């Protein structure tokens, strides 16, 4: 398996499996001189960790992070930063019924056909458990971006199943388990999930992420465009089946006179481009949305086949999120932050001395 590393100058390599002794990552390319403690990382991991409400998996993992290297006396040294998170609440016996059978909608069948071996315990390497190290690395990226450029990366749930969640205020996002920016709609979301759990079924969600304060100029055309790398990173998150930048698929029905964001001395009029033009950041907010499919592990019996190709019925008994989108907000934030820090360093390496006579206009004229 060779696709375990994200990034070019700021790289993150993850390791581990869902039911192994530990999971973690190695971060290479983090600039030296930044203050960093385990507490800086833990606060982000706590936002993602399981067992925090009745609406998510009841697997009880503390997700306590250990910094093994790359930090001396609370300051990054510029050497690789190794993060370790120990698994403490595995129940491998829950997966005994799928040793010879593939779960529909999971990576079981494809991993088996590609590698000729698979870890059936919780999906092994393909488990969303492996997003914890991504959030850990994302905490490092967020801190550097915030301190160096004033960049803030924030996300929220904008849709759960067929329930739209109108944005009200960022202050509500951290006050409920859904990362909803609308406190009034939380009871409806809770009732929806309670009914879904009784049905033994699952549902999908939409997560919106916004990066504010990104300077103009980040991105490496043609094949490492900023939006292309964002899309790749987001599609690397478990269960993500769609990514939109800016207006996204709504652009199809927009006329050019509407979609094209006009420029004025006071700033851009509109942000249908989502903060990226020609693969390069414009200085506006970078806006990203992801579509997350329903959890494939459900208690409803499903048709499948065995390794021998015989027909079988699969019913999943492990502890699973009825909607993986509920805990996906900090993961999506982290992925965006990892792409941004990588491109910040790449821009500094090649174009850090470039200056033009054109004023940098503000992100919005309104």
From Swiss-Prot:
Cellular component aspect of the GO annotation: cytosol
Entry-linked InterPro entries: Chorismate_synth (IPR000453), Chorismate_synth_AroC_sf (IPR035904), Chorismate_synthase_CS (IPR020541)
Gene Ontology MF annotations: chorismate synthase activity; FMN binding
Binding site for NADP(+): 48, 54
Annotated residues for binding of FMN: 125-127, 238-239, 278, 293-297, 319
Pfam families the record matches: Chorismate_synt
Alphabetized CDD domains for the sequence: Chorismate_synthase
Keywords, in A-Z order: Amino-acid biosynthesis, Aromatic amino acid biosynthesis, FAD, Flavoprotein, FMN, Lyase, NADP
Annotated EC: 4.2.3.5
Catalytic activity: 5-O-(1-carboxyvinyl)-3-phosphoshikimate = chorismate + phosphate
The keyword Flavoprotein belongs to this UniProt entry's keyword annotation: yes
Enzyme class, UniProt record, top EC level: lyase
Record Gene3D superfamilies: Chorismate synthase AroC (3.60.150.10)
Cofactor note: Reduced FMN (FMNH(2)).
GO BP terms: amino acid biosynthetic process; aromatic amino acid family biosynthetic process; chorismate biosynthetic process
Pathway(s) of this molecule: Metabolic intermediate biosynthesis; chorismate biosynthesis; chorismate from D-erythrose 4-phosphate and phosphoenolpyruvate: step 7/7
Required cofactor names: FMNH2
NCBIfam families the UniProt entry points to: aroC, PRK05382.1
Self-association state and partner proteins as the record states: Homotetramer.
Function in brief: This reaction introduces a second double bond into the aromatic ring system.
Protein family according to the UniProt entry: Belongs to the chorismate synthase family.
HAMAP family named in the record: Chorismate_synth (MF_00300)
Protein name: Chorismate synthase
Organism placement in taxonomy: Bacteria, Pseudomonadati, Pseudomonadota, Betaproteobacteria, Burkholderiales
